[in-house]
Amino acid sequence: SIYERCELARELINR
């Protein structure tokens, strides 16, 4: 889902 993609992307940006 788009929301899941956003969550994953957010984690990558946060690292």
Curated annotation (Swiss-Prot):
Main location: secreted
Domain of life (superkingdom): Eukaryota
EC number annotated for this UniProt entry: 3.2.1.17
GO biological process, any: killing of cells of another organism
Subcellular location: Secreted
Tissues in which the protein is found: Expressed by the venom gland.
GO cellular component: extracellular region
Catalytic activity: Hydrolysis of (1->4)-beta-linkages between N-acetylmuramic acid and N-acetyl-D-glucosamine residues in a peptidoglycan and between N-acetyl-D-glucosamine residues in chitodextrins
GO molecular function: lysozyme activity
Keyword field contains Secreted: yes
Keywords: Antibiotic, Antimicrobial, Bacteriolytic enzyme, Glycosidase, Hydrolase, Secreted
General function of this protein: Lysozymes have primarily a bacteriolytic function.
Family: Belongs to the glycosyl hydrolase 22 family.
Protein name listed in UniProt: Lysozyme-like peptide
